[in-house]
A protein has these predicted regions:
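A detector for small-residue-rich transmembrane helices and their helix-helix packing motifs
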Residues: 1-158
């Protein structure tokens, strides 16, 4: 009905205390790592755009099925954070801060499996957010360059 702002606002709505608690626990663990890696503004942009990306994929699949469900929650945006961290871990050769590629992939698989085997979990929003976060990280994240000592002094002889 043209109410496209709902693709944005759904990220801030939740279906109860347990729903918001689960999302906030993951956000508290993963968010600061990504914010430190990307900076405040890029992190905020990624979070918001990944949330809209998750909502959009969810909506597109509802149109394709012809079945419309209520969808809400921050998990699309949070999966966007996970997708971005997956890219960052990949370009840092499988490890970044306390994260490993295997650990992130395990978490993604377990989370999606839980969603598939549970009732009323919008995996399309999760997948959309994950993909959007991954793509945005490719665009926005720049691996820091190693510092070069131009003083001419040997750092190993002091």
């Amino acid at each position: 009905q043209g109410e496209y702002w709902r693709l944005f606002t759904a990220t801030f709505m939740h279906f109860g205390f347990e729903h918001i608690l689960n999302n906030m626990l993951v956000l508290i663990c993963a968010g600061p790592i990504l914010e430190k890696a990307m900076g405040h503004i890029k992190y905020l942009c990624l979070y918001l755009i990944a949330g809209v990306g998750g909502s959009t994929l969810s909506y597109v699949q509802m149109i394709a099925r012809g079945k419309y469900d209520v969808s809400a929650g921050a998990s699309g945006a949070i999966f966007g954070i996970i997708g971005a961290l997956l890219w960052i871990v990949m370009i840092h050769k499988g490890r970044y801060e306390s994260l490993t590629g295997k650990g992130l992939l395990f978490m993604i698989v377990i989370s999606l499996y839980y969603g598939i085997t549970s009732v009323d979990v919008d995996n399309w929003a999760h997948i959309g957010g994950l993909a959007m976060g991954f793509v945005l990280a490719i665009i926005l994240y720049r691996k820091p360059r190693k510092a070069v000592d131009l003083s001419g002094e040997n750092p190993y002889t002091n």
